[in-house]
Amino acid sequence: MAAKSRKKLVTLILLILLAGCANQLPPGGGEVDKIPPEVVDVYPPDETINFDDDYIEIEFSEYVDKRSFQEALFISPFIEGGLDFSWTSSTVTIEFKEKLKKDITYTVNVGSDVVDLNNKNRMANSYSFTFSTGNKIDRRMITGRVYAEKPEGVLIYAYRLGTETDTLLKAKPDYVSQTGNTGDYELKGLSESNYRIFAVLDKYRDLIYDLDQDLIGIPCKDISLIADDTLFTNMNFKLFKADTTAPRFLKGIMTDKKHILVTLTEEIDKRLLKPSNYLLFDSTTNEKSQVQYVYQKYGKPAELIFVPKDKLNIDNSVYLIADVLKDTLENKYQNDFIHLTISDRPDTSAINVIATEPKQNSSIDFVDPKIIIYFDDGFEKNDIQKHITFTDTLGNEVPFKINFDDDATLVVSPLKDLKADKDYIIKFNLNRFIDSEGNKGDSLYQFKFSTISGLDFTGVSGNIGNFDNELNPVLVLESYNRKGLQYQKKITNENFEFDRIEAGKYFLWYYSDTDSNFQYDFGWPQPLKYSERFSVYGDTLKLKPRWTVTDVQFNLK
């Protein structure tokens, strides 16, 4: 009996142990694992020479997602024939289907897209090692950084320069690396050659730049790694979308008999928000009619609202025609048109204010302010200014002018600077704002705001190292967390100063304004146009109210 009991006990213990081995799950409760995986060992060791095996091995600090690893593995130069992968625990063996080339330095790059198995933590940085099938390691290297909102995971393409330089991006690169979470990258083990480097946010990870899908960073120059030139640093990139597609109409539907809602493929140039660029064509009667108002739908820049001047017949076939549709990159499409779904639903809604910039009861700068008021419909603009008052809270009038971004957007600008630390009111009666159907409001609208104190501003000053006026340098102070807030100025000597700056976190950078248009040029991929050279100050500047940061030393690279 005792022997049988012991056998049952041993069997039970073995079953428990086997179950534990077969189902290795993290214990319940406790802190969530946030530790990124790391490469802890490789075969062959970094910088091995005379390598003649047909496989390499990479060991991680924990189990990783196999698919993420395979998509993040790049071996340069490209290995013909493909690879086979086999896993043992947290170690992967990569076998080469064809023999490696003789006297070649290979670089293995494990990109930062690798994630662990349980919590999908990404590698903090890419990892690379080199080995050679010959008796020496090519030690040439290129380093830099990609500056983007999300800089991790960007691929760095390196091409040896030959005769077909304008078709490089149609082929896979000779060498590949990937940025870590800071945007830094290294291209190691490069052979002696001239190189052209691109940064590509490769959506499909196929190592071919897709103009319609991928963001790209263009180099400011090509790189020569010949003879004693073995290292090039600070090949930095800014990413952008090389858009070559003109905007088009997608859909047009009348929400009532006086409003046509049109969806486009992208936002158009605001200079085309004018009725004269459009017309309505009734193909049933072969008659044309005019657009009375056109404006952008608030918060949806790719949607426009058109107000027809004449009534459209619900039984007829009607088209909206644009003389030209153009985006901000000057991509244009002539004579686009779209068939409309007609409605005879009455328009009885009174016009209203739907938003303002700045917001109601907020504070703005007293120097050259602009107040933008968004309405939900187009309106008659003749003599509208005489129905608007602009005063301080004591009733003192402020001289002002008005203009219109489109037929439903009013911009109010004082003719001189306002006073600091003071309250102001813009008033108008909505019964003076009349839409195309004669609908009007019946209430008094008041927009209240205040100006900031001049004491709340901050500033920064310092010195430029390696200053060269022939580079036509422009210095930019750009907000770290407020999109669109930046200050820039052309610098003509080694000293610089920014004053009247809103407090906050900023990064400081410069670009060489070679075309003198006071705007950074990202370049162009095909045919190649180099980007403008730029450099970024290493530290984030924390600018506090009423305090100027001085003695910033910015060395241009």
Locations of the language-model features?
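Phosphate/pyrophosphate-binding loops and the adjoining catalytic core of nucleotide-dependent enzymes
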Residues: 466
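Bacterial Sec-dependent N-terminal signal peptides
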Residues: 1-37, 496, 552-557
